[in-house]
């Protein structure tokens, strides 16, 4: 068996390696003459703790302490959840536009979206993400209304294409809050409008759609996600991803 590119040894005597020190042992990273160490850092977010940009900064800081002569490049990545806006902005430019909206638990939160020409990139996690949950608040009672408020503002200032990054949601309302913020009405059995949450979706008996989203002048709406789960069923989004938010489904 050939020598591993990353080997573990208790005695860092080899002249072609740099000891990478951990509390209980040394790792040897071979250095080949004429080839400097190059490190590429590509972290996604650490759900509920670090965004991809924060993770990249921490990893890069530690790497520079161990390998001060290394060529290090950081490219935070995202899958449609936390950090998507920062990833797109770093790759494509654009300007962050701040906005205050309703958070998933009804609180006011400071959010933002990314403007690139006539396109607005909206990150659901910036308005209804897991990091915005209040302690003890059930995801069956959370709302995506803040996401709709961002979209409404983006349309109001002239954006004609809306791209929504769907990951990292703290909600189970099937986007009803988002639709309500854009003028859609959800009706109960008596025909009265109300705002559905995951706990009250079964009470919806009728829907009045906002005509703004139909016709030749309707904005273009696109969604970003990295899964193909259906809405419901054993492998459905409600069952699989609702449990990440601690919903009992």
Region spans (language model):
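Acidic, Ala/Val/Gly-enriched low-complexity intrinsically disordered segments
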Residues: 5, 13-16, 33, 169
């Amino acid at each position: 068996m050939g020598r591993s590119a990353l080997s573990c040894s208790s005695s860092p005597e080899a002249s072609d390696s740099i000891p990478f020190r951990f509390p209980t042992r040394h790792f040897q990273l071979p250095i080949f003459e004429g080839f400097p160490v190059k490190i590429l850092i590509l972290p996604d977010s650490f759900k509920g703790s670090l965004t991809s940009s924060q993770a990249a900064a921490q990893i890069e800081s530690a790497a520079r302490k161990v390998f001060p002569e290394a060529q290090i490049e950081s490219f935070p990545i995202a899958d449609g959840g936390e950090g998507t806006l920062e990833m797109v902005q770093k790759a494509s430019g654009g300007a962050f536009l701040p906005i205050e909206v309703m958070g998933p638990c009804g609180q006011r939160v400071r959010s933002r979206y990314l403007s690139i020409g006539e396109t607005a990139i909206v990150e659901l996690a910036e308005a209804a993400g897991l990091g915005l949950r209040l302690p003890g608040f059930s995801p069956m009672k959370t709302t995506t209304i803040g996401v709709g408020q961002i979209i409404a503002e983006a349309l109001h200032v002239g954006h004609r294409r809306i791209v929504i990054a769907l990951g990292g949601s703290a909600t189970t309302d099937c986007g009803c809050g988002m639709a309500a913020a854009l003028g859609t009405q959800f009706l109960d059995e008596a025909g009265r409008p109300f705002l559905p949450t995951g706990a009250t979706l079964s009470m919806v008996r009728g829907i009045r759609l906002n005509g703004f989203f139909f016709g030749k002048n309707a904005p273009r709406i696109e969604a970003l996600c990295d899964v193909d789960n259906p809405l419901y069923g054993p492998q459905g989004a409600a069952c699989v991803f609702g449990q990440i938010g601690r919903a009992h489904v």
